[in-house]
Amino acid sequence: MEASYKSESESEAWPGTQRPGTGTVSTAVREHLRKLCLREFPCGAGSWNKSRFLPQTWRTWRELVPKEEDVVSPGEETVEALLGLVRSPHSPWALLNDSNAEDSFLRELAIRNPLMITDTFFYSYFRSLRVVDKEVTLVDKDLLKFLKLEELVLSANRIKEVDATNLPPTLKVLELYGNEISSMECLCAHPPAGLQHLGLGHNKLLGPLESLYVTADHWPNLVSLDLGFNDLTDLQSMVASLRTLRHLRLLVLQGNPLALVPYYRGLTIDSLAQLCVLDDITVSPNEKHLFRGLSLNGDLLAQEAQFVVTIGNIRGVLDTSVLDPEPGPEGPFVAYSYYVTYDFVRDEEGEAVEDTGELAEIVKPSPSSELLVDESPEEVGEDVIKDIVGGVTEEVEGSLESEVEESGESELSVISGPSTVLQTPRASAEELAKLRLRIDPRLCPSPGTVLFNTTHKPWAEVIPCGYEMQHSLRDLVPLKAFLLAGTTVTIVEEKILSWPVVLPAVDSPLSAKRGKGEKDKKGKEKDRKGQGEKEPAKEWKVPKKKKELPKELRQDPPILQVLGRGLVILEPLLAGEPLVSTVCNFGMVRTLTSDRLTLARDSKKIKKVAKKEKPKAVNPIYESDYHPEPLTVEVQIQLNQCRSAEEALRMFAV
């Protein structure tokens, strides 16, 4: 039926559809109106409703006929039938799913009174325009034609700069969320005087100078301001500028580096007394009381963020030692230990790290570890080998054995092949260069980060790490990027092979001299007996137990194996959450066979318990009841936040 219909303006161009260029706001608006098909069936004027729009003189004679019913001409549709076509969700002319109530109103208006659909109508009708995710790059001057426009939403586009002279003076709401604007300076050239809301969240505003553009000189009537998730720094300068906005009631600053300092919320609330909502959280009277007076000393507060990283228990670790054969007298003697590593951002301005729990080890990225990122780590260049050799040589000359005993881990985390040992501290660089060092890329920190690890612990069903580390950072922009990326947590197994050292028997001059002295002593005693002299009484000595001297062992470089590795999302800390607490689950690594071997070993130990003690029964493991615990580790990262003005001044006053 509709195939026979023909639009009266089918051959005409849509008014105002000339496209001056792609990527403009006006082009996106026209494209949207074109998709509404306001001049095509069942909207607009055409053969389906042309009798309704005949000149009045042609219809006069019909009106003179008494009691004549209005009859639709053959081939035409009633208004109700046409409205049914656009309202029915099953109709091919139904609106698209992303359409709004305004689109529905325009289509019905184009059916009831299609002659109203003109450029003049559009420019005077629209009070709100929403152009979202349309690849818009330019706010063009055609927007000035919208005489009553009050709200302009241009979210999720690719706008880098806004010419404020192209904004209608009637504008009250300007939303530019999710664009690529790097400075507010372009908006301040000729801002709409009556603007009440400005949204610039998730853009690329950077640095402390942006505070110059949020004053009452540019936005005298601003009530709501969204600057969240940019790279704004210098909280003190920002709140000093915002203080001039007397009408400001709603403010969003979370997601910026300046919001990571512990006193951020308190200083902002005390500086902006008229503020009602900060970061979508209502400002309470109690908060205003707790932080009263903090703004008077705001310039004395250090601009740094503080995090506390806590690592709890490791569970579900495979006891690898039960898979090794019993060592013979010649070795090797195997020792296993387990620890957790995580990376944290490096502070270019000098990181202050405080260990508030057990001793924490820091593995700083060496030049070699940063370069070895290939999947085949055996392919090591000569330059890299030289760097590694240099670092190893320095460690060797500084008493290699004592370093290993104190730290429990060589600074270069290497995975060795066949056992290769540094026999003497004076090993030459040529010998060291022959070592085939293999560095696991998974144990190297990401660029711009430092690798931290817990102390090494022996195997247990539950391995308690007891780790707590405080990180204080002043370089806040890289810190924000790190929080967006997250930290990588790794569980590492360290295996060290030890071998007995066989010392060659060498006759020294000291031992020869000692032997000669004993021989002379025996000769004198013999002469004394021959002369009849009495032998002096020998002192009675208590027999002592023979002490077994500990065998001297040499150790191979540690063999490191990554048992589990995963990413911990830290973005909630940037979005205002004070704590991220999670249990990293790396799946099953234990097997029924390994657990049975562990059970058998433990049962042997129980049999050796003293006879007085009643041995505990060990339940056997059956395959039907076997439910191994997955490999997990507890991780918690907290962003420090001050709860009062007194606490902020005590902790951060310079």
From Swiss-Prot:
Keyword terms: Leucine-rich repeat, Repeat
Zinc-finger among keywords: no
InterPro entries assigned to the protein according to its UniProt record, in alphabetical order: Cilia_flagella_integrity (IPR050576), Leu-rich_rpt (IPR001611), LRR_dom_sf (IPR032675)
Domain LRRCT: 256-294
Tagged with keyword Repeat: yes
LRR repeats: 148-168, 170-191, 194-213, 221-242
Residue ranges with Basic and acidic residues bias: 515-542
Region (Disordered): 1-25, 510-548
Name this polypeptide is given: Leucine-rich repeat-containing protein 43
Species: Macaca fascicularis
Encoding gene (name): LRRC43
